[in-house]
Structures are given as structure tokens and as C-alpha cells.
Amino acid sequence: MKHPITYLFAALSMFALFSGAALADTYEGRTKCSSCHKSQAKSWKDTAHAKAMESLKPGTRKEAKVKAKLDPEKDYTQDKDCVGCHVDGFGKKGGYTIEAAKKPLAAVGCESCHGPGKNYRGDHRKAGQAFESKGTTTQRKVVADKGQDFKFEEACAACHLNYEGSPWKGAKAPYTPFTPAVDPKYTFDFDKMV
């Protein structure tokens, strides 16, 4: 080895490159979750959450878009003010991006409610296996400390109650145009909906 420092630098660079990519990819997508949660994935497939990104495409949900004063022929799949409520992890590390869209994140999937799965999935799986085999439960704190989110009401409100004049204190721009004033079906009450 004529240049050990060069080799060391190259090795450290490769390590930094690959470990950085792994750390950035914290959202895994619904395919990872559905490998164990088959019945949940099957029932989710037919929901509006599963088709959330589809609703942003031109020509879809025309009547709703017209009521909300949106152009029904516009492609909103590239609109950063809209996409965030239609995908997993938009604007967050490892989440959906318009520039490098990942299909498993292109819907309101598991990680929209439960948080990015990479850091807690292993402990979540072990807890499930322990429950299935021995009937033992795992403290919620174990997976919460690894990033599994249990603030479901907040997660729902971030999109369903994010409009001007909302009773939710966390409402902020960009606001959803789909409000109860546009159509009563957009009235959201967490306790009744979930």
C-alpha cells in the first residue's frame, strides 16, 4: 500500500456515503408493514387514504375540486401545497419527495399515522411475535422511544382540520381548500371518524 492515507480516506468516504443514505431512508413504505399486517393492508386498499395521490390527478374528483375552487383539469401531483396531505412523510427526512417519488410512499399509508418505520420496525415486530407466541405485551414506550408515533389525533388533524378558521390550534398555511364550509362531508371529528 503506497498511499495508506488515500485508502483510509476512500474507505471513510464510502462509509459516510452509505451510512448517510441508510439514515436518510427512515420511511420504508406500506409494503414493509403489509408483510405482517395483511388484513389491515387489504382493508386499507379500498379507502380514500389509499387513493389520496390519485385524487390529485387531472380529471379526478372534478365536482369536489370545483366546489373548492380548484381547477379540475390541473395536475396537483407536483404541487407542494397539496402533496403533503396525500403521501407519507412529505417534507420530512426520508419521506416522499416530488423530485424522487417513491411509490410505496405515494398515499396516506401506515407511516402517515405511525411515523417512519425504519427505526422502530424491528422492535415492533419482536413485540408482535412475543404477543403471538406467549401472550406477553410490550410497553408502548419501547417502540415510542424508537419513533413509532401514537399521536393519532394530531396526525389526522394536520390534514383534516388544517383550514382557516379551524377549531384546531395547529392550523397553518398551506391550508386545505376542503373545509366544512365547502361541503359538510369535510367536517372532521376524530372520535367519530376513527
Predicted regions span which residues?
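Bacterial N-terminal signal peptides that target proteins for export
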Residues: 1-11
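Cleavable N-terminal signal peptides
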Residues: 10-12, 21-22
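Sequence context of c-type cytochrome heme-c attachment sites
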Residues: 20-106, 111, 117-150, 172-194
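Short, functional "switch" segments adjacent to catalytic/cofactor/reactive centers
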Residues: 153
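A conserved mid-domain beta-alpha-beta active-site/ligand-binding segment of alpha/beta enzyme cores
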Residues: 156-159
